[in-house]
Amino acid sequence: MKKLIALLLVLGGLLALVACGFPVQYKDGGDGGKDETPVVQPDNGYTLGSTDVVQLNGFRSIDIEWISGSVTVELYDGEGIELKEALADGGAVSVPMEWRVDEDDSTLDVCSQPKLLSVSEEKHLTVKLPRSMVLHELDVETVSAAVSVDLTDEDTLTLNELDITSVSGTVYVNAANAGEISLSTTSGAISGSVRTQNLEADSVSGSVELTLDVLPTELDMETSSGPVTLTLPAGDTAPSLFVEFRTTSGQFASDVPVTHMKDAPWELQTVSGSVTIALAQ
């Protein structure tokens, strides 16, 4: 369970960043009063607030760090990248997000708020990517924010790596077409459909329920108590899988023939969580 331990350490670091920020300062309302609008300054090199289009030429990756609320990534007909944020309750955002273009790393960095603020708001972030975009990596890290990545429209986006990590937020992916996909959570559920040759999913107590549009060449899944359900694509003949399944008290069930062997291309490890491999109807 080394990967699960590493996951907990990473997620603990995210929580520490939230807890260790500076107290937020507020504007002087005059006449001894206090304006409840916080004074927010961006980190060095960052810009505050939503932006209609970020023009990116030859960009390598997008890194998103979000605390609470939700993150939605989808495709659209534009030529740049749209970043929009809004409060969950529809109110005005008082602690805006910040973003920057890192020319050295060819990366777009997006944060839910300046890193040294201790206050946070439950906000929805919508990221729209051009359908024709070529991107090496999309990396999303959240604390309690739910993550939804929907790349269904014509599957024209070229993406090499998709990496999503959350503490308690749910993770949903739809037709995520990438060379490598990694999905990690502590207590949030992981669900959706994926198309990849290399799939990794890690959970402690959250469930994992994924439909595989194609059979990955390599698959690695670890859970503690969360159940795992993998639905394979339907075909004229059922595939025969080579699987290494390690567990303490978990159960394994499969609708297709499985050969259990050490160091198999598909590795499934649980403590008490069940694993089910089903065939799409």
What are the roles of these predicted feature ranges?
Residues 11-12:
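Repetitive helical segments and hydrophobic/amphipathic motifs
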Residues 16-19:
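C-terminal motif of bacterial Sec signal peptides marking the signal peptidase cleavage site
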Residues 63-65, 117, 139-141, 145, ...:
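Polar/charged low-complexity regions in secreted precursors and cytosolic/nuclear IDRs
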Residues 87-89, 110-123:
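Secondary-structure transition/turn motif
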